[in-house]
């Protein structure tokens, strides 16, 4: 082998101008070593340089020869990367310019479209323009076809888009017939509970296209100019056309059979062909042809809609015919009672019956009068000699009715007064007025004069003057400046009020009860309240029945009447009376007062209408009502959660504990449920409305046929939530309240009758006796009772209604104003499952309970407090009832006392809450908590009797009852335990061995929203969790993978639940 140095030198490519280009394109892989020699130091042949700026060279080559090393290659890579980045930036710039250009084009298109729409709707009214804009907005497509964009607030809607069906959704209430584009609109409609079948606007969609109709020849014109040209052409003819003739604006069309309104004539024709409504409901004249859509003027449309809104309706169950007054009550009824039935809406009148108001028989053009029958038409023709036009079609009748009502200058024909005719007060009486031609005097009833001398039977007269004012008088001779004031006086004097059907709140003013319905119940059918008589404790469904009730049961303020008086004059004095009236009659006038009696000053006392305390003088009652300290009610409200408080210190502590020391105060009026931002507004409200809320109660001096026993005794004890009182002074009042309360409990399903021989139930004793006589005639024994009365909340059975009612009062009723002593500690009780016992054991146990209840009644007199009972056998919830649930939740109130306060919304239907308490904890039911009240009312909440005073007593009770329920309930029902103790994790493992889906939630690590979402998601994914548990039981070797899979599915279920919220 030769010298390796020469071989290495030969392997280096020659340097020179020809080789520079080829050297630049070469890679490191092109260098080849042709031979290997003995290892020698490379430093002998290569000069090493310490600086990166100098080029390395060999000892035997020219200075012009250069080779590329690692640094050159890195520089080439950097140059290529920079070039690639520059091209990428250029492409992004071009794309951004294209996007900006497309956005500018879109903005220009929307601007042009808006100008076009403005030009199109310029000839329409403001209402039509707004309706048209809303209609166009609803038709605009979203970001995707058939989807709704979630928007920026995607924390609860991370699933992307919500699918919307193109087909309208029909309201599930029969005869409601309202359709909605999506489920959100349907849900709002169901909560408002506006299912009136008498609604002509359910088919009134889209914008109105107005036309103008002539009431003489019934021709229609598209524009007003065409109508004016028509009047100008017909002015010469003597047929009623003149330049001052106003047109009727046609905005919609009505079906001649059902009188539903449509925006377009084509839609009405399509409806008539689909429903076969080609025959008319009202036949006028000899017109027997095919019916056509009726042109409906704007005046008739507004009047028909207003009259239909005043038609009362009810939603009933088709099976039991029970009246359902709210969406919550409807849902609970069909989930608990009539599962296979449905609701139906029934109205007192149909749309056709309301539209009969527009049907006329004749019209007089000379005096602009309409006639509803042929008799009045003929009488007018004979008396006046006018030519009366006979109406031959429904369309002519509607047009002439609107023309006569709008053209008549009489105020009584105005639309508002036409609507007020249906709202005429039933307490008003019409007094006859006789005029004397000689003196032009007005007869005044003698009771109005308030004369002391009753020996004169003549009629007093006052000289008529030009200026006459209307005055309203009550039967008690008080004078009022307006009809509203006297009607309010009659209502207050007869203790009439307004009662909310949903929550039972009673108000004295109709405006306050409507505001209460709107704010508290979300506007759920604003008329969902009744008239309530405090004296008789009677509900009146309609205002028309008030007159009959007041006349029959009340006295002194049964009606009011209207009289015309000379302005500036008082009642008849000695100078204005007739000769048969002596000068000793009073000359003073009856002043207009609301809170004081007449000038005769009868004996009596002043009563505060808030607390019903009596006072001897008006000054005392005024000072009492003016003082805020006289009445105890909520005055402050938390601006975060709207929870009311009595004291501001309590509100401060609440904000520090619940809202991270962020104090926001609002002022709350607990008397009428109004909220104010500043204290001055609250004080002004109290001074204007509640500081004068007192009335004078006169003492009856005349002889009465009633005895002392007939006068009611005022009970002063605390009132329960069912309407009864905690204790009674008078046995008559106790008997009346108990009988009324028992009937209400049976009607509302809080108590019911159940057959002992089968599972049949009934709401009254008559139906149960009929069932036993017809079905169990052979088995029935006359000496033995064949039925029991069951509690609707805990399903405990009793042998008589009185024992069941006492049980309900003792266990499921609370004080309306609870005291601390009411929720005192109880002694330990005995618990026993009785749902799965045999029929004989149940009878034996019921007999024992019945005998015990009789012994209790003998020891307690006129009191519902049974705190002295040393031992009581408490029945746990019925297992048959628990099998219908979809989720059982065990709550440890020792660790989570404010469980219901943390819930942001309602839990899913089928969730049963079982609460436990022990140790030194004394859990109290939350006040004014809608979620707790709803669960307690439908029987989905059970408060376990107090455990022992041990710290972990509630934990042991939860483990014991959860284990018992695990043996007897279906495995697909999940169990959830809400407690902060780590020992329950072992219970979860034990449940997995029995294939029971169970979850242990720590209240200290969860917020209210997350906790509510977890509970709802567990209820929704019952089957999925059950299948996962079955797989885990079969494959015990992959337990860790199962846990991770279950957590992922649980998070997915939580996400879906949050999307639904």
UniProtKB/Swiss-Prot annotation:
Functional note: E3 SUMO-protein ligase; has a preference for SUMO2 and SUMO3 and facilitates UBE2I/UBC9-mediated sumoylation of target proteins. Plays a role in protein SUMO2 modification in response to stress caused by DNA damage and by proteasome inhibitors (in vitro). Required for MCM4 sumoylation. Has no activity with SUMO1. Preferentially transfers an additional SUMO2 chain onto the SUMO2 consensus site 'Lys-11'. Negatively regulates transcriptional activation mediated by the SMAD4 complex in response to TGF-beta signaling. Inhibits EP300-mediated acetylation of histone H3 at 'Lys-9'.
InterPro entries with a match to the protein in the record: PIN_11 (IPR041192), Znf_C2H2_type (IPR013087)
GO process annotations (BP): negative regulation of transcription initiation by RNA polymerase II; negative regulation of transforming growth factor beta receptor signaling pathway; protein sumoylation
Name of the gene this protein is made from: ZNF451
Mutagenesis or variant effect for residue 188 to E: Mildly reduces E3 SUMO-protein ligase activity
Subcellular localization: Nucleus; Nucleus, PML body; Nucleus, Nucleoplasm
Mutagenesis / variant outcome for changing residue 706 to R: No effect on negative regulation of SMAD4-mediated transcription activation
Protein name in the entry: E3 SUMO-protein ligase ZNF451
Omega-N-methylarginine: residues carrying this PTM: 158
NAD among keywords: no
Motif PLRP: where in chain: 38-41
CDD domains in the cross-refs: PIN_ZNF451-like (cd18721)
Highest taxon of the lineage: Eukaryota
Modification(s) after translation: Sumoylated. Predominantly sumoylated on the N-terminal region that is important for interaction with SUMO1 and SUMO2. Sumoylation is important for localization in nuclear granules; desumoylation leads to diffuse nucleoplasmic location. Autosumoylated (in vitro). Sumoylation enhances E3 SUMO-protein ligase activity.
UniProt key word Metal-binding: yes
S-S bridge residues: none
Pathway(s) this gene product operates in, as recorded in its UniProt entry: Protein modification; protein sumoylation
Family according to the record: Belongs to the krueppel C2H2-type zinc-finger protein family.
Region span, Important for ubiquitin binding: 1050-1061
Zn finger residue spans: C2H2-type: 169-195, 253-277, 315-337, 362-386, 498-521, 531-554, 606-631, 636-659, 667-690, 753-776, 789-812
Native organism: Homo sapiens (Human)
Region entry Important for interaction with SUMO1 and SUMO2, spans: 1-344
EC number: 2.3.2.-
Enzyme class: transferase
PTM-bearing positions, type Phosphoserine: 155, 432
């Amino acid at each position: 082998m030769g010298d390796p140095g020469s071989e290495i030198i030969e392997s280096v490519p020659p340097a020179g101008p020809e080789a520079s280009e080829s050297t630049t394109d070469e890679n490191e892989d092109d260098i080849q070593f042709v031979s290997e020699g003995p290892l020698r130091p490379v430093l002998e042949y290569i000069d090493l340089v310490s600086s990166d700026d100098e080029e390395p060279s060999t000892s035997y080559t020219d200075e012009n020869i250069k080779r590329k090393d690692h640094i050159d290659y890195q520089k080439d890579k950097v140059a290529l990367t920079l070039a690639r980045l520059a091209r990428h930036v250029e492409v992004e710039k071009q794309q951004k310019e294209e996007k900006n250009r497309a956005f500018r084009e879109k903005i220009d298109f929307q601007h042009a479209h808006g100008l076009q729409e403005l030009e199109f709707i310029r000839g329409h009214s403001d209402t039509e323009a707004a309706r048209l804009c809303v209609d166009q907005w609803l038709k605009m497509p979203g970001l995707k076809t058939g989807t709704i964009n979630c928007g920026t607030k995607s924390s609860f809607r991370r699933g992307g888009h919500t699918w919307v069906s193109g087909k309208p959704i029909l309201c599930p209430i029969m005869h409601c017939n309202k359709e909605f584009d999506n489920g959100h609109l349907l849900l709002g409609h169901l909560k408002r509970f506006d299912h009136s079948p008498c609604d002509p606007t359910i088919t009134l969609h889209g914008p109105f296209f107005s036309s103008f109709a002539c009431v003489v020849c019934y021709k229609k014109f598209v524009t007003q100019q065409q109508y004016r040209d028509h009047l100008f052409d017909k002015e010469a003819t003597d047929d009623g056309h003149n330049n001052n003739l106003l047109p009727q604006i046609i905005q919609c069309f009505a079906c001649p059979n059902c009188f539903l309104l449509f925006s377009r004539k084509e839609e009405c024709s399509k409806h008539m062909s689909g429903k076969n409504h080609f025959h008319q409901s009202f036949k006028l004249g000899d017109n027997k042809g095919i019916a056509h859509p009726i042109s409906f003027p704007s005046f008739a449309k507004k009047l028909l809609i207003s009259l239909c809104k005043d038609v009362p309706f009810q939603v009933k169950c088709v099976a039991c015919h029970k009246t359902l007054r709210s969406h919550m009550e409807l849902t609970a009824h069909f989930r608990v009672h009539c599962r296979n039935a449905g609701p139906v809406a029934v109205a007192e009148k149909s749309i056709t019956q309301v539209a009969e108001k527009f049907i006329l028989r004749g019209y007089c053009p000379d005096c602009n009068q309409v006639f509803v029958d042929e008799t009045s038409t003929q009488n007018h023709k004979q008396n006046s000699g006018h030519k009366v036009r006979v109406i031959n079609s429904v369309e002519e009748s509607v047009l002439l009715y609107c023309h006569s009502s709008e053209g008549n200058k009489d105020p009584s024909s105005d639309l508002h007064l036409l609507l007020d005719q249906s709202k005429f007060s039933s307490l008003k009486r019409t007094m006859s007025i006789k005029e004397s031609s000689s003196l032009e005097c007005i007869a005044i009833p003698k009771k109005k004069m308030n004369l002391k001398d009753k020996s004169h039977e003549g009629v007093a007269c006052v000289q008529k003057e030009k200026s006459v004012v209307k005055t309203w008088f009550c039967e008690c001779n008080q004078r009022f400046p307006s009809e509203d004031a006297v009607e309010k006086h009659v209502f207050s004097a007869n203790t009439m009020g307004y009662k909310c059907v949903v929550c039972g709140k009673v108000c004295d003013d109709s405006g306050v009860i409507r505001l209460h319905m709107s704010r508290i119940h979300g506007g759920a059918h604003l008329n969902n309240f009744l008239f309530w008589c405090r004296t008789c404790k009677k509900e009146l469904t309609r205002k028309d029945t008030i007159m009959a009730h007041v006349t029959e049961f009340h006295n002194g303020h049964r009606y009011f009447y209207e009289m015309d008086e000379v302005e500036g004059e008082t009642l008849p004095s000695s100078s204005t009376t007739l000769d048969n009236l002596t000068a000793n009659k009073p000359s003073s006038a009856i002043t207009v007062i609301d809170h004081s009696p007449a000038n005769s000053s009868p004996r009596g006392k002043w009563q505060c209408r808030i607390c019903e305390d009596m006072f001897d003088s008006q000054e005392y009652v005024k000072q009492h009502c003016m003082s805020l300290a006289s009445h105890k009610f909520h005055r402050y409200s938390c601006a975060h959660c709207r929870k009311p408080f009595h004291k501001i210190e309590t509100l401060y502590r609440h904000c520090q504990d619940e809202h991270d020391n962020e104090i926001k105060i609002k002022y709350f009026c607990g008397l009428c449920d109004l909220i104010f931002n500043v204290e001055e507004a609250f004080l002004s409200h109290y001074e204007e409305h509640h500081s004068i809320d007192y009335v004078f109660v006169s003492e009856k001096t005349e002889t009465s046929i009633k005895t002392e026993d007939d006068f009611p005794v005022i009970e002063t004890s605390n009132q329960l939530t069912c309407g009864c009182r905690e204790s009674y002074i008078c046995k008559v009042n106790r008997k009346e309240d108990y009988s009324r309360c028992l009937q209400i409990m049976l009607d509302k399903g809080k108590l019911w009758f159940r057959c002992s021989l089968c599972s049949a139930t009934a709401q009254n004793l008559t139906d149960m006796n009929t069932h036993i006589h017809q079905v169990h005639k052979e088995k029935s024994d006359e000496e033995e009772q064949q039925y029991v009365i069951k509690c609707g909340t805990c399903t405990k059975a009793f042998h008589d209604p009185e024992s069941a009612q006492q049980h309900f009062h003792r266990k499921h009723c609370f004080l309306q104003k609870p005291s601390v002593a009411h929720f005192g500690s109880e002694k330990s009780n005995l618990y026993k499952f009785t749902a799965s016992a045999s029929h004989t054991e149940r009878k034996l146990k019921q007999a024992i309970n019945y005998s015990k209840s009789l012994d209790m009644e003998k020891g307690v007199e006129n009191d519902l407090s049974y705190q002295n009972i040393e031992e009581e056998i408490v029945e746990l919830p019925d297992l048959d009832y628990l099998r219908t649930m979809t989720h059982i939740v065990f709550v440890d109130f020792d660790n989570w006392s404010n469980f219901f306060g943390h819930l942001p919304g309602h839990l899913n239907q089928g969730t049963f809450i079982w609460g436990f308490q022990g140790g030194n904890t004394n859990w109290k039911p939350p006040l004014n908590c809608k979620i707790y009240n709803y669960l307690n009312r439908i029987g989905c909440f059970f408060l376990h009797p107090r455990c022992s005073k041990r710290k972990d007593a509630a934990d042991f009770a939860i483990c014991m009852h959860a284990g018992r329920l695990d043996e007897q309930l279906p495995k697909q029902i999940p169990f959830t335990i809400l407690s902060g103790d780590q020992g329950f994790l072992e219970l979860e493992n034990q449940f997995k061995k029995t294939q029971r889906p169970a979850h242990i939630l720590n209240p200290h690590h969860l917020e209210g929203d997350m906790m509510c979402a977890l509970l709802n998601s567990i209820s929704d994914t019952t089957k999925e969790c059950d299948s996962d548990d079955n797989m885990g039981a079969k494959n015990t070797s992959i337990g860790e993978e199962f846990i991770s899979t279950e957590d992922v599915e649980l998070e997915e279920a939580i996400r879906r639940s949050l999307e639904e919220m």
